[in-house]
Amino acid sequence: MLLQQRSHQKYHSGGLWSNACCSHPVAGEDLKEAARRRLNEEMGFDTEISPIFHFIYKAEFDNGLTEYEFDHVFTGEYDGLVTFNTGEVMAFSYKKMNEIKNSLLAEPGNYTAWFIQAFPRIEEWWRKKYEPVSSHTTGQDPFA
């Protein structure tokens, strides 16, 4: 899974690890198109994406800001060059699902509030999609 470490220039959650990108659509913009636009603006690439779930998230931040949002989660596949926007992102990393899960349990303070809330459902979706295929074809757990 592709993760980004948010730039310290962000108005909240700077330096924390999170999903590949986040966005708010502009008035009249389709949600999927907004997500693809921001993926390109933040991570420097475009790929086909599909919605997998949505959730309501609420968090209060150290700077006094409170977010209360209805978030949509999309997924896609990409194995090309990542040329991230340094105003948005300070680093990126590809991680296995178990690595993320273990890190979230050991060091939750390294992750954004919304990613902590979304990850269990992302992991559930991932297992349903990939576990039956990989365990039958290779006999190995792709999450280890």
Question: What role is predicted for each listed range?
Answer:
Residues 45-55:
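A short coil-to-beta-strand element that immediately follows conserved catalytic motifs
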Residues 44-46, 81-82:
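Secondary-structure boundary elements
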Residues 4-8, 12, 47, 65, ...:
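N-proximal short alpha-helices
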Residues 21, 51, 72-74:
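A structural signal for short, well-ordered beta-strand segments
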Residues 3, 51-53, 94:
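Structural signal for conserved beta-strand scaffold positions within catalytic alpha/beta enzyme cores
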Residues 1-41:
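Conserved Nudix-box catalytic region and its N-terminal flanking loop in Nudix hydrolases
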Residues 15, 27, 56-61, 65-144:
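Nudix hydrolase/Nudix homology domain
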